[in-house]
């Protein structure tokens, strides 16, 4: 809950009169996005040409409104954030921070790079695994993976003339690491996907395939509450909005149990789930639904890999954490609303290059007992029904109106449920297709024979997400993506004390598979 924190900021650099000044979009200037920065590292099993990558990204920022990526962040007189976009970029004011270094060794021989997940070893082993990531917070690792002097907190951007994007390219004898760093206020992961697609198109010499940048000055999420039909539909959980003493009680529990006592005792780790395990769980879930006759006229008999993955992980967390069986579980599942924005006519299409934060959440409320005792298919189907019920234009408009009203009037995020609920949150990046990023046009030579790997030339075999958080993130995480072999990669934050219980559950899955 970073919105409860206050601090003094250094004086910002002087305003450059030729800069284009644009107010932040509403959901980009949010306590959550302001308090989180990302370092997304792509491991490519080939040796890439750093100069080709740099030149392609520089060229992209010269194309139309794509120069907004090079904006500087300032605070206006009212306290809101705004972009100062240079008219052009040069050595004094570059469009992005950049650095590169080459090592005459393999990845496995470098003291920092060797600590990253080893995708080919994990894929060959075929077992679920948990990898410690506490090393990513060490000064040695951060100085290795990030561009030097590039900010990692909002205050760093405000007191400097730093661009929003940082790029670090590290080459080895057998692979290349490409790290893209940015403050979450710039975009969500679907927006990052748009940036990577455009960068790749320029790299291939296909500027004609670069989509027009959407939302340079206009906020496509503005006016969502202007419904096509009146009256505006009621949000499905409107009656459970925490206000007054209920919000105060929830906030007090959060501050006392997490912010004051647990924040420094939470740990973030990478979870590797082989393709076969999720396939087996989904097949079993579908069989359970069929046997129970879960199909009804309104909801098709279907659960996706994402539904099953979230249901499984929620069960893993609850088994390790052991909350009271009667307690309510709030499963918060984020979704991209670009298709709905296109349906409402706010953007040209669902696949346009919209670089902003356009995510909302669907909520599924069950008891701890239900998640632990009912078959996995039951929980997955409840998640699916929540998506169908809430992921539509009418519910998005209703939710957006409540969230804005709560933030503007009560000055805290809108929360739904009950004050004693247990929350498990997941953001699924699979649709961002990060494992399909194509840097093949920059390949100098192969680092690994294509016959010995699943990923294609110039595409990542592993993606690691790290960063800096200005608030506690316990029981929060992401599905980084699905690699070329169909394996899933997660990054999740839990209490340090319960990770051994999580690891034991994943070990049991391996033993059951071997039996």
Curated annotation (Swiss-Prot):
Task: State what induces this protein.
Answer: Expression is positively regulated by the sphingofungins biosynthesis cluster-specific transcription factor sphG.
Keyword terms, alphabetized: Acyltransferase, Transferase
Used how in biotechnology? The sphingofungins A, B, C, and D, show a limited antifungal spectrum of activity but are especially effective against Cryptococcus species, fungal pathogens causing opportunistic infections in human.
Active site: residue positions = 184 (proton acceptor), 438 (proton acceptor)
InterPro entries, alphabetized = CAT-like_dom_sf, Sec_Metabolite_Acyltrans
Q: In which pathway does it act?
A: Secondary metabolite biosynthesis
Q: What is its EC number?
A: 2.3.1.-
Free-text disruption phenotype from the record:
Leads to an increased accumulation of sphingofungin B.
Reaction(s) the record says it catalyses: sphingofungin B + acetyl-CoA = sphingofungin C + CoA
Q: Name one GO molecular function term.
A: acyltransferase activity
Q: Which family does it belong to?
A: Belongs to the plant acyltransferase family.
Self-association or partners: how does it assemble?
Monomer.
Function description:
Acetyltransferase; part of the gene cluster that mediates the biosynthesis of sphingofungins, bioactive molecules acting as sphingolipid inhibitors via inhibiting serine palmitoyl transferase (SPT). SphE can also convert sphingofungin B1 into sphingofungin C1 and sphingofungin B2 into sphingofungin C2.
**The protein's name in its UniProt record:** Acetyltransferase sphE
Q: Which organism is it from?
A: Aspergillus fumigatus (strain CBS 144.89 / FGSC A1163 / CEA10)
């Amino acid at each position: 809950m970073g919105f409860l924190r206050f601090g003094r900021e250094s004086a910002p650099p002087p305003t450059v009169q030729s800069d284009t000044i644009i107010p932040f979009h509403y959901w980009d200037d949010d306590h959550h996005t302001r308090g989180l920065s990302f370092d997304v590292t792509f491991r490519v099993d080939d040796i890439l040409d750093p100069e080709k990558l740099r030149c392609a990204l520089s060229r992209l920022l010269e194309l139309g409104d794509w120069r907004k990526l090079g904006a500087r962040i300032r605070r206006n007189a009212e306290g809101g954030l705004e972009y100062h976009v240079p008219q052009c970029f040069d050595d004094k004011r570059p469009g992005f921070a950049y650095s590169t270094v080459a090592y005459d060794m393999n990845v496995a021989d470098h003291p920092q790079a060797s600590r990253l997940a080893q995708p080919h070893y994990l894929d060959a082993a075929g077992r679920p695994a948990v990898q410690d990531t506490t090393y990513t917070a060490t000064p040695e690792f951060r100085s290795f993976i990030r561009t030097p002097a590039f900010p990692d907190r909002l205050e760093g951007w405000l007191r400097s003339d730093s661009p929003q994007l940082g790029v670090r390219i590290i080459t080895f004898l057998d692979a290349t690491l490409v790290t893209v760093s940015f403050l979450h206020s710039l975009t969500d992961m679907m927006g990052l996907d748009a940036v990577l697609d455009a960068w790749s198109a320029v790299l291939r010499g296909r500027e004609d395939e670069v989509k027009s940048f959407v939302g340079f000055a206009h906020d496509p999420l503005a006016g969502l509450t202007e419904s096509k039909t009146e009256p505006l539909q009621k949000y499905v959980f409107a009656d459970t909005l925490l206000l007054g003493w209920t919000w105060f009680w929830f906030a007090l529990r959060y501050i006392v149990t997490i912010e004051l006592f647990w924040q420094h005792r939470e740990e973030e780790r990478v979870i590797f789930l082989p393709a076969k395990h999720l396939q087996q769980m989904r097949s079993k879930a579908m069989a359970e639904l069929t046997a129970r006759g879960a199909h009804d006229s309104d909801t098709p008999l279907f659960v996706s890999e994402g539904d099953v993955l979230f249901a499984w992980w929620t069960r893993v967390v609850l088994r390790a954490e052991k909350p009271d069986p009667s307690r309510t579980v709030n499963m918060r599942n984020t979704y991209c609303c670009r298709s709905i924005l296109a349906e409402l006519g706010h953007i040209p299409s669902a696949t346009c290059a919209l670089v902003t934060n356009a995510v909302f959440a669907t909520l599924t409320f069950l008891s701890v007992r239900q998640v632990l005792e009912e078959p996995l298919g039951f929980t997955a189907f409840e998640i699916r029904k929540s998506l169908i019920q809430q992921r539509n234009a009418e519910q998005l408009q209703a939710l957006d109106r409540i969230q804005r009203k709560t933030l503007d009037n009560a000055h805290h995020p809108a929360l739904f449920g009950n004050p004693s609920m247990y929350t498990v949150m997941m953001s699924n990046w699979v649709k961002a297709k990060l494992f399909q990023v194509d840097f093949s046009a920059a390949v100098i030579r192969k680092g690994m024979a294509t016959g010995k790997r699943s990923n294609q030339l110039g595409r990542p075999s592993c993606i690691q997400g790290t960063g800096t958080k200005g608030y506690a993130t316990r029981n929060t995480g992401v599905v980084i993506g699905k690699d070329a072999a169909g394996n899933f990669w997660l990054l999740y934050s839990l209490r340090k004390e319960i990770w051994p219980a999580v690891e034991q559950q994943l070990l049991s899955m391996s033993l059951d598979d071997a039996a």
